[in-house]
């Protein structure tokens, strides 16, 4: 029986490392799911802001990351597009030519900390399109966002 004493430690090391990997995998899956849900909600909020705020207002892109998602950079991952009546992106949007606003999150990589697996995964693109409303202009003049 004494000769088997080391075997239990080896078994525990193998099984324990697999269980820890499974535990970290569950935690990382929860964090990745939270990140995707937060970015989806942030995209919806930013599209709503884009519909009522002046064209190219910087507060639109910052609204996407309202939950503080780790590793997210609004300047590189958020694209705000102003669309015409046919849904084509406008190169130089003006108040009279914008019919829809579209906010999308692209190329965001979710960092992972699971030992032995990939260090990151790329999230799918989120895009929300809404009809343009006031675009920051009212009867009293322009309004700030």
Question: Can you describe what each PLM-predicted range is?
Answer:
Residues 45-145:
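Short, conserved structural patches
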Residues 1-66:
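Alpha-helical assembly-interface signal, strongest on the long, hydrophobic N-terminal helix that forms
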